[in-house]
Curated annotation (Swiss-Prot):
Region (Disordered): 73-100, 129-150, 162-199
Protein name per the record: Transcriptional coactivator yorkie
Protein species of origin: Drosophila melanogaster (Fruit fly)
Keyword Transcription regulation among record annotations: yes
Record-listed Phosphotyrosine modification sites: 228
Modified sites of kind Phosphoserine: 82, 88, 100, 117, 145-146, 149, 227, 232
GO cellular component: cell-cell junction; cytoplasm; cytosol; lateral cell cortex; nucleoplasm; nucleus; RNA polymerase II transcription regulator complex
Gene Ontology molecular function terms on file: 14-3-3 protein binding; DNA-binding transcription factor binding; kinase binding; transcription coactivator activity
Family from the record: Belongs to the YAP1 family.
Residues annotated as domain WW: 241-274, 310-343
Organism taxonomic ancestry: Eukaryota, Metazoa, Ecdysozoa, Arthropoda, Hexapoda
Intracellular or extracellular location(s): Cytoplasm; Nucleus
A matching Pfam family: WW
Post-translational modification note: Its activity is regulated by multiple phosphorylation events. Phosphorylation at Ser-88, Ser-145 and Ser-227 negatively regulate its activity and restrict its nuclear localization. Wts-mediated phosphorylation at Ser-145 promotes interaction with 14-3-3epsilon and 14-3-3zeta. Phosphorylation at Ser-88 and Ser-227 regulate nuclear localization and activity independent of 14-3-3 association. Phosphorylation at Ser-146 by Cdk7 promotes its stability by preventing ubiquitination by the DCX(DCAF12) complex.
Amino acid sequence: MLTTMSASSNTNSLIEKEIDDEDMLSPIKSNNLVVRVNQDTDDNLQALFDSVLNPGDAKRPLQLPLRMRKLPNSFFTPPAPSHSRANSADSTYDAGSQSSINIGNKASIVQQPDGQSPIAAIPQLQIQPSPQHSRLAIHHSRARSSPASLQQNYNVRARSDAAAANNPNANPSSQQQPAGPTFPENSAQEFPSGAPASSAIDLDAMNTCMSQDIPMSMQTVHKKQRSYDVISPIQLNRQLGALPPGWEQAKTNDGQIYYLNHTTKSTQWEDPRIQYRQQQQILMAERIKQNDVLQTTKQTTTSTIANNLGPLPDGWEQAVTESGDLYFINHIDRTTSWNDPRMQSGLSVLDCPDNLVSSLQIEDNLCSNLFNDAQAIVNPPSSHKPDDLEWYKIN
């Protein structure tokens, strides 16, 4: 019996030892990483793209129609025609368009037959008649929400004051308003008493209606901005330079620049530097025009003289400089000359353009030589010259 118990105890100890050995080896086995590769990854990704690109091929569960869902009645009511994304303040300015529509607060209950549960009827719309005054169309777009539209309010108030001054039979309350184009403190004062303050009236339409009774001399055509450009003095000095002596630059209360001439004790809107530049441009244009006329006259005179003298000698060539002066080239001697080779007398000193003789002097010499040649042709010298002075007087 003892032998059996000892054998069983030895067996149990061996089993426990083996278990302990496995526990000691377990951390070593955990270092072995297992890599699993899913071969269907590309197919699954392609299936996702196909479900988006081809929605008809994908199997979608059936959805409940909108009418069968528990949605409020306002979900199926279309918006008002004047309510759009283009309006810059739909909830504020468009509230006046719905002011004439009132919804009944009390919902009528309809009793169903056969003991069914009562159903609340849809509230009916009660449309009230429009007010007596005719309302203008509302066209408040985003383009008019800029600060430049403040000038339109400025013009509207100015025209209303002018109309009240021209019409003595108008409402006295409107004539008690202070004259001058001031902005209203409350926007509700600009609208009729029957219309809500939140309703927006088209400013352009109001300007058109009011301008029909105002003369053309009082109408303002330039609405949205000033008719002058506000430029800093530093920028003007950089572009145009300093002011001439005796001039000073100043500004009005509105910021418009004007100029004072302390010499003549006068003021003007135009910049004297711009006026000086314009005068310089005019003078330059006149000088260029005069030079063109002079060059044309030179070329015409030179061509006329050349045609009367006949062709050039052999080896000579006629050319013109960049400034329009005429000179001659001798290809035989390889020299240049201002003198016409067809006229050999009186110009031997001016044989080279390096002498820098002005073209006007050359033309004067040419004209004097031509005049002498013409006189010799018309009045040939007589071989017998009498000593009597009367002959010289007659001839």
